[in-house]
């Protein structure tokens, strides 16, 4: 926080943009990490249980309009392609790409899904992702259609208009 108060734009691996959004600079995924993931998922698949992996975007990938020019636009997409290729090698694994609700729409729409000064989504973003994951699982017959969370399952809070799950 001291670095940011002094006017620095980069502090502790985070970039502070003029309007106060914090973003991390994307870094390439290491092949060794993908190999370790493949191995772990293959071992988990040997347990003869349904295995699902959900691909979700990082904050800076969803709010790509805010990224400074010196961020590589290709890094996130290259990481996703490498991950998808690695996951395709794992037998019996269902892969769900649940990024659509978080990366489409206007910047103002997408900003509603993330904390401004943290690096992950808020309750609204978590709901959008969970709904997309459940929708795809229901479409594949893995779960019942009635299991897909709906906006009616949440109540508006008096503070900030956030919805909270009431289960």
Question: How should these model regions be labeled?
Answer:
Residues 1-167:
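Extracellular glycan-modifying ectodomains
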